Structures are given as C-alpha cells and as structure tokens.
Amino acid sequence: MYTKLLDKQTKLALIGLGYVGLPIAMEFAKHVSVIGFDINEDRLDKLRNCIDPCGELPTEVFEHKDITFTSSIEKLREASFYVIAVPTPIDSHNEPDLSPLLGATRTVGKVLKRGDYVVYESTVYPGCTEEDCIPILEEVSGLRVGEDFKVGYSPERINPGDKVHTLLNTVKIVSGCDAEALETISEVYKLVVQAGLHRAPSIKVAEAAKIIENTQRDVNIALMNELSIIFDRMGVNTFDVLKAAGTKWNFLPFSPGLVGGHCIGVDPYYLVHKAKELQYHTKMINSGRYVNDSMGRYIGKKVVKKIISQGKNILGAHVLVMGMTFKENVSDIRNSKVADIINEFKDFGAEVDVMDPFASPLEVLQEYGIRLVERPGKKYDAVVVAVAHTTYLKLDESYFMSITNEHAVLADVKGVYRGSIHQMIYWSL
C-alpha cells in the first residue's frame, strides 16, 4: 500500500475537509495523490479556488499539491487508503451524535475494495471504531475486516489557531486492527509527521488516549474556574495567585476561562456516555463540565453587578462584547460560551453589541441569532473582552475610555490587560 501510494498507482482519500481534515489532506498531497471529499458544496467551491473556509491555511499552501476536491462518491473508488476526519459533536442532551461519523463510514463502505485501508481520526469513545464503525463497513461493503480490508485509528491533534504545534511536529498516535495494519498505517503517516509516531497496542487504547487528553484539560480548567470564583469572593486576583504558585516546578500552568469549541467542551461527554454504558457514574468529569458550562452565565452576572454598583440601571444599559469565537485567532464559533454571556445580559434587559474580526457575521446570525457590528457604535456602560484575539491585545485603556460612558466596567475574561487599567472599573476571572 505504502509503495503504491508513493508511486501514485492509487490514491489517498480524506473524508471531511474542515479544521482537522484539510490540513491533513494538504500535507499528504505533498507526497501522494489525494482526493479531498466533503458533502458541503460551498466549502468545495472555496477550496477549488484555493481558499480555506476556516481561514487557517493561506492561499500559497494550495500550490503544487496533488489534490482533487469532490463530493462524488464514485470518485472515491480511485482511492485505496481512506482517512475519515469528520466532526463528532453532541446533541442537545449532551449525548454523542455519531451521525456524521457513521454517515462517512457508510459512504466509504460503498466504495471499499479488497486490500483497502480505512483510518479514523475523529475523536470518539473507546470502542466506537470496532463496535460502531467496522460493522457498518462490513455490512455495506460485504467484506470482512482483517481478511479483506484493514482498519486503524489515529486521533487528530490539530489545534486551530496554533502555528507552533502542527501536524508535522506533534507526535502522532497510530493503531491498527492487526500487526500488518499497524505497520502499513505507520509507514503512511511517517510521510507527514516528522516528530515521530507512538504505536498504541490497540485501537481502543488509541481512542482512550485521545479522549482523556481533552478530558484532562477540561477538568484542570474547571478547577481554575472554581478557584477563580472563590478568590473573587476573597478580593484576591486569580492571576496573581497563579503567578505565585507557578514558581514551584510541579505546578501545572492552567488558567481560568471559557471552555467551548468542538473538542474540550464536547469530548468529555463521550467518555461519560461510555461510562454510563458500563454502569459507572462519572463524578469528577461531570463536575468539571458543570463548572465550565456555567462560566458564561457567571461572567454575565458579575458584570451586571458591577454596572449596578455604579448606580446605573441595568435595564437598557449598553454593553459591548468583543469576541464571539470559541477561542482566540480562529473563525470557529461552534459551542462558543460567549453566547451565554450575551444571553445573560439580555435576560437582564441590557442592550448588547457584539463584534469579532474573525467570525463570519452570517454564521453567527444563523447559529446564535446575533448580528455582529463592525465597530463600536455608541458609548457603553460596560465592555467585555471575551476572546483574547491578537488584534485586541494592542488596545489600551484610552481606547476603552473613548467608547464608554463615565464609570464604565471593563471585564477582561482572560486577564490580558491586568495591571494596565487604572481609571475604569476593572474585573477579570
């Protein structure tokens, strides 16, 4: 398989061309012939014109790459090595929504041939690949795993907006349904990963490793958020405490903040789901999720109290929220907890303007019913810097004072302006 790919006697297909799939596809396209498959025609049109809809990859990345973008299932028949990197979200009840993953699996099953390989990159609970996906591949294709085709799991570690930790320089976990599959999958991924591979002993181990990466981070941030609530009641600045505690060599460098997006705020629920199937009720994971999911409303309430403390009526107060994406310097608005802050203000009768230089106004309107403004349009009683975009880091107190009324509140969620605000009412986590 490896030699056939290198000699371009066959092709590699990447299913799902979003934040995760596209960077992987573009790296492989430097070495082998790639079919980039997606069901979103608007996304495909942009990609064919060398535009990354996610805003992560510059135009020049598309140059000199052996890649074809398509939504044609028939085109997939030209491939023999399939990589599935589609979203694995949760539903309104915080249960895993496997419909994109299982849909992609059925699509690949329709074109699967003897000798083919299927590798999953999507984050799932341990057991999902073997218990949910492989049976569909076998049913649709009429083939048998191990005998007729091979399956592996290699969890994605793409971090949108991060130009330091990339696919190339981040160790990649690989696993396979048997020793032969593991060897071949490892050979193929060596083409695009310079940092080396970690060969997991089983698919289930690789799945579990990925799910706990994000669960661990979620729980640690939840601890910082809870400490922030406690320290706020003491009148102690959380970041001052963390700076002092960080002088010890084994203190872990986490900080409080909003936890949203398609990974950290979602993946723990996949592990919770699997634990419930095993008749175990997760305690720490659930507690962490509760704390982090409540932080948007908590921030909103704190700012409301600050406004009222200045003798102002919150009903009709003007608030500007800066940042709508789930994290800094990305366009992704999925599961953004900034929406909770905004809704809290609206529940109290405040008038809210929202701006974000990275977010798509149309996507924000469709997802949250919020109309973004391009620039501040009035004098505000409070400004909430909810997302620490690089463009916001250059702003100073004089700017914030120029767009606010007297005795205005500046809520600095990530604490990026701490120590530099002296005249406004300042608050941070």
What are these regions (language model features)?
Residues M1-L429:
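Structural/interface elements that position substrates and couple domains in central-metabolism enzymes
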